[in-house]
Amino acid sequence: MQSSTDILVIGGGPAGSTAATLLAREGFSVTVLEREVFPREHIGESLLASAVRIFDLLGVRDKVESAGFVRKYGGYFAWREDSWETKWGDPATGGQYGFQVVRSQLDHILLEHSKSNGASVFQPYEVTSLEFDGERPHAALWRERNTGNTGGISFRYLIDASGRAGVMTTKYLKNRRFNESFQNIAFWGYWRGFKLPNIGPSGAILILGIPDGWFWVIPLHNGTISVGIVMNKNAFAAKRRMGASLQEIYHSEIAAFPMVAEILVKAELVTDLQSEQDFSYISEECGGPGYFIAGDAACFLDPLLSTGFHLATYSAVMAAACIASISRNEVDEKEALEAYSIAYRQAYLRYMVLVATLYQNWFGKESLFQEAQRMSLLNVSSGEFISAFNNIISGIEDMQDMGDGRIRFVFSEMNRMTETHFPKASKRARMAQEPLSPTEQAQRKVYAEAVNSCHLFANTPESAVNGLFVRTTPRLGVSRSERTP
């Protein structure tokens, strides 16, 4: 391995590979250190429609399409007494679509694409420590996990895309805040011989609410379906204390939900069950001098709306654009970092409001759609709530633009919203895990209005964050808006 590089990327998942591809194409020397060997298994199979635009930007869409993944034209929700579908398009008439993917396959495609665009990728290399000049990281020590060989590499800029491990956030900054309400356990397996019901759009994900959480059902191109359960950690722990095994909990929940039981009545579970914690968190800052934190390394949200891949890749696009323009002296590093951190956190918080609406303050689907309408800025008229909901959860809303000029007001309101849902450690012990009070519900609506005043990931001069917006042509970077806030 070389002793120095322009850009060091920790992690080769979607955030890391997206940033690596874009920066390598801009002529930077890019080194990716990935602790696993791809292909490797990963959860997060359901992609929003915005993924197609990312694949186009990366120049990898043909490779993704040729893999044969299921095209996802929307989703079907059954939550308490209500049910509805979100439809982005249709195979016969066209329109927007995402994908239902095997992540081991997709992530491998994206990382190999980074290589083909000039990035140097090393696997299985883990970063054991970072070296700093004040607050600025400038070098990393690494270990090759197979041989135990060690070494170091210096860099100009760091992109921490290390996933939930979060090298910067957990080891150095220690600035993660966990959401006390969204602390769940996810467990899942893969089935063959199933029969899907004739509901929802083509290739839809099924999101099915249960008393202590929800099911996902995702059709995959390899002839299997992914059937998973996300369950409140306390409910899960109570079942375990009563002597139920993971397998017993999984199968009993399936048997208790008629739709899922019918889907699997003649099916065979062809894998072992897998599980992991789904504890939502947000970082107080997503960047600092010489570094950007992208994807799950910065923020993780309950997977209810399938936003993980979307947030990871869009944060990577903006981080790459900021680094490109900083390096060309087009923008100041400090203002670019501030714009990046604000834009990414607000993207996260907008989805968090919708998830909170489902989990904590459920008064029927119209309540959910109204929250979406408040946060949508795509000229959705009053009452067209389902359209607003579709715009946001497809990820297309984020593509339109990233902000308007009222950033100072939004930033202060966003901080208040963060304090409500992600208390600092000193407050956690005092926070009961209960639904929001009427006062807190009213506050949340105020915070939603604050989010409503700011678009995400600006791509026009009229919609800039801190006066900056992302451009992808003729070169990737960020430009300054002449518009006065």
Each PLM stretch: what is its role?
Residues 2-13:
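Beta1/beta-strand and adjacent pyrophosphate-binding region of the FAD-binding site
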Residues 16-17:
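N-terminal Rossmann-fold NAD(P) dinucleotide-binding loop
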Residues 24-43:
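Glycine-rich FAD pyrophosphate-binding loop
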Residues 42-80:
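N-terminal FAD cofactor-binding segment of flavoenzymes
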Residues 92-112, 237-244:
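Short beta-strand to alpha-helix junction loop
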Residues 113-260:
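Predominantly flavin-linked oxidoreductase catalytic cores and closely associated redox partners
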Residues 237, 241-322, 327-350, 355-356:
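FAD/FMN-dependent oxidoreductases across multiple families
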Residues 324-485:
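C-terminal helical "tail/cap" subdomain of flavin- and related membrane-associated enzymes
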